[in-house]
Amino acid sequence: FHTFLYLKLNTRVISLWNNNLNLEKVFREHISRNSCFLYKVNFKYKCIMATTNFKGQPVKLIGEFIQVGKVAPDFELVKTDLSSFSLKDLNGKNVILNIFPSLDTSVCATSVRKFNKMGAGLKDTVVLAISKDLPFSHCCFCTTEGIENVIPLSDFRFSDFDESYGVRMADGPLAGLLARAVVVIGKDGKIAYTELVPEITQEPDYDKALAAVK
């Protein structure tokens, strides 16, 4: 099949029409990874790139947003003490991923506070707050706010989580940060619930996320 591949290179937009061409070779010869956002494309199966909105303007995400029923990809993130944290550390538990752009925004901060309150009464469930904020910011916020029922984690070092779960914003004012989303992983290690919040400035649906672990 034919695939349009769009790459944002500085201020130019390059549109490539794939007719069984070796696009990987084209990328290596003509495109620097440091000067563009590269959208991964599966040439065997159609890959649908998810989108969200920021203040009403469409924002593309890199990769494919994680789907219900799939085995949750493992990931490595950074804790407030700068040590590594992996999903496999939580085997046998329900896991709620509260994913957001930055704690420096009111909506993101509110989501952490609310999940912290809700997390206090959940059995066999761990809530993770994930963003690109530095661990120092996570530590400062959680200490100041008295956050005890949420584990704050940063994706600043490894940057494998954002691609595996399809939540990195590819364009717009917040390009490079994580989109607002909630993902629930069941005790069996499979994705039980997802919400890609359609508008970055809005809060997620907390009740539906909690219902997925009860």
Where are these predicted regions, by residue range?
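Short, contiguous, well-ordered secondary-structure segments
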Residues: 1-4, 188-190
